[in-house]
């Protein structure tokens, strides 16, 4: 949101006691400690936010283009309130009504529009059902917080069993959500984080919350693979007084691993980078398991490569974490080293090969036969 947009949104939300959801990977667009904050919508977002918005009769969409990643179903819930009145506010007129049908479109600055609406509210606006609404928000958030804490396993689609096999293959390894819980236990509330594209970073969408703006760097719909490391370096250059942590899967990290050769130079500030190590391109593999009968092509990564080893070779500190306790301890020490000793740490978090939901289930479908192609021509791949 533009300058002043978060504060203007807070004032309006409090006047109505209306729950506030944010878009995919925009977890810093509203204070996470606010009682009306319901979390991010979209892929692996907040079930609380999804359940609350599904009950809405009016939705005010401030400064958002309502992109598919922020509105697609999650956890089996098709939550977008198709019968509600939708008011969309955006500076770009081309985005109004682009992805969702809107009742009212407003071309304008989110902060100015929110302030104007607040100033025009009638006395008693929002009073009807106010107490019940506040209780519903609190209860829904509490229920989701308990459920999220207990979530460990990723679910398979009917007719597939990749995640069952992944757990059986590495029963002692962390699941992705176990790693995210371990990270949350040591991540400073004031930290700036960056997220690369990919399955394991996206699984973590529901976990981080922020009490200040400009704390979450994410690639958004551009989808640039390798974004996580260089963006967190830039964040540290801009805010050397703030702890920073970058996140990337091992596939995406391989795109920017060469930056490790530069980070160790004396005039570069120290950072912390976590790499989720499961030796696969996860998002692509999930599509393969669901729509191509486990016919993986180019999704496997070399298990002989050690990113922690590469970091050490570049004069940095490389650490391997195999358990939740090890990961929490490694991150806590890395933050201390970053802020007090000027040491850059790369943490390889060793996780099993479980896969989250496909990114765009709504945009994919089963393949169809193509004329002239015989399935007998297909060769079995050894994995």
Question: In which residue ranges do the predicted regions lie?
Answer:
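Active-site diphosphate/adenylate-binding microenvironment
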Residues: 9, 143-241
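Short internal beta-strands
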Residues: 19-24, 87-90, 273-276
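Glycine-rich phosphate/diphosphate-binding loop of Rossmann-like nucleotide-binding domains
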Residues: 1-14
């Amino acid at each position: 949101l533009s300058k002043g947009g978060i504060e203007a949104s807070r004032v309006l939300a409090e006047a109505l006691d209306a729950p506030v959801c944010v878009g995919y990977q925009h977890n810093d667009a509203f204070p996470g400690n606010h009682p009306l904050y319901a979390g991010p919508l979209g892929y692996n977002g907040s079930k609380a936010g999804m359940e609350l918005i599904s009950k809405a009769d009016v939705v005010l969409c401030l400064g958002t283009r309502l992109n598919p990643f922020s509105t697609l179903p999650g956890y089996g819930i098709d939550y977008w309130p198709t019968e509600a009145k939708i008011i969309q506010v955006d500076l770009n007129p081309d985005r109004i009504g682009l992805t969702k049908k809107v009742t009212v479109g407003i071309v304008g600055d989110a902060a100015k529009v929110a302030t104007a609406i607040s100033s025009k509210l009638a006395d008693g606006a929002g009073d009807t059902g106010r107490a019940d609404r506040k209780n519903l928000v609190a209860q829904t958030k509490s229920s989701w917080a308990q459920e999220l804490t207990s979530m460990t396993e990723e679910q398979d689609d009917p007719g597939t069993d990749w995640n069952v096999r992944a757990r059986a293959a590495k029963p002692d390894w962390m699941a992705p959500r176990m790693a995210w819980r371990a990270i949350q236990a040591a991540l400073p509330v004031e930290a700036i984080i960056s997220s690369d594209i990919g399955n394991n970073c996206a699984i973590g969408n529901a976990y981080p919350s922020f009490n200040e703006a400009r704390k979450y760097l994410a690639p958004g719909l551009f989808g640039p693979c390798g974004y996580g490391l260089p963006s967190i370096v830039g964040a540290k250059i801009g805010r050397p007084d703030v702890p920073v942590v970058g996140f990337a899967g091992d596939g995406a990290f391989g795109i920017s691993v060469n930056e490790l050769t530069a980070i160790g130079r004396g005039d570069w500030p120290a950072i912390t980078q976590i790499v989720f190590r499961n030796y696969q391109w996860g998002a692509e593999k999930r599509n393969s398991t669901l729509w191509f009968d486990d016919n993986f092509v180019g999704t496997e990564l070399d298990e002989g490569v050690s990113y922690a080893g590469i970091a050490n070779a570049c004069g940095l500190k490389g650490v391997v974490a195999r358990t939740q306790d090890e990961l929490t301890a490694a991150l806590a020490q890395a933050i201390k080293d970053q802020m007090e000793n000027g040491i850059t740490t790369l943490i390889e978090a060793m996780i099993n090969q479980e896969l989250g939901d496909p990114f765009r289930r709504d945009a994919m479908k089963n393949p169809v036969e193509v004329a002239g192609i015989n399935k007998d021509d297909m060769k079995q791949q050894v994995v």
